[in-house]
Amino acid sequence: MEELTPRQNEVLRFLEGYLTQYGYPPTMRDIAAHLRISGTLGVSKHLTALERKGYIRRDPGNSRGISLVGHGSKSASLPIAGVVRAGMLQPAIEDIEGYLAIDQAQLKGGKFFLRVKGDSMVNAAILDGDLALIRPQPTAENNDIVVAMVDGEATLKAFYRERGQIRLQPRNPNMEPIIIREGEGEVAIVGKVVGIFRTLE
């Protein structure tokens, strides 16, 4: 499914909660009142976006004619929490740009997405613009693909702990690894990449 803006995600969560509590969908006025949207025109705009992105279906002739696509299946809406470079070290951008709903079976402990920038991981089928699902954890095993902070800057690489050093290895033969020798820098694992999601425009 396509990504949601924070406001669209808020509308969708309200629809899900209302359906769970009452067993039927809210009216547009219910949505407007709960989310403090002035008038039903603003609500209609959000519902149109949710329908276009495949999250809901609407029956124009029914004031409560809203149904959730896949309602009853278990899904989770996770934040897209910023950008991480698959390339040279750069500061991470921690700014929620939207949300993406995925089936809970795909979570694998993932808590948030980061949008990948760069092409250093192309041979691991991780492309520029992909969404990497991150499971927060402070440690990693050799060959894990991780988001790591090196002296305060973030990168997405394959992790290797070797004698006297840590190697953050790209999956692109044209790129050089990042080597951090003991005592020469600080490496912190943000989390492990447990899934890659690609949205089509």
UniProtKB/Swiss-Prot annotation:
GO terms for molecular function: DNA binding; serine-type endopeptidase activity. The record marks 86-87 as: Cleavage. SUPFAM superfamilies: LexA/Signal peptidase, Winged helix' DNA-binding domain. Its EC number is 3.4.21.88. Residues 28-48 bind DNA. Keywords: Autocatalytic cleavage, DNA damage, DNA repair, DNA replication, DNA-binding, Hydrolase, Repressor, SOS response, Transcription, Transcription regulation. The active site is at residues 120, 157. It catalyses: Hydrolysis of Ala-|-Gly bond in repressor LexA. GO terms for biological process: DNA repair; DNA replication; negative regulation of DNA-templated transcription; proteolysis; SOS response. Disulfide bonds: none annotated. Represses a number of genes involved in the response to DNA damage (SOS response), including recA and lexA. In the presence of single-stranded DNA, RecA interacts with LexA causing an autocatalytic cleavage which disrupts the DNA-binding part of LexA, leading to derepression of the SOS regulon and eventually DNA repair. HAMAP family: LexA. Homodimer. This is LexA repressor. It comes from Geobacter metallireducens (strain ATCC 53774 / DSM 7210 / GS-15). The lineage of its organism: Bacteria, Pseudomonadati, Thermodesulfobacteriota, Desulfuromonadia, Geobacterales. The gene is lexA.
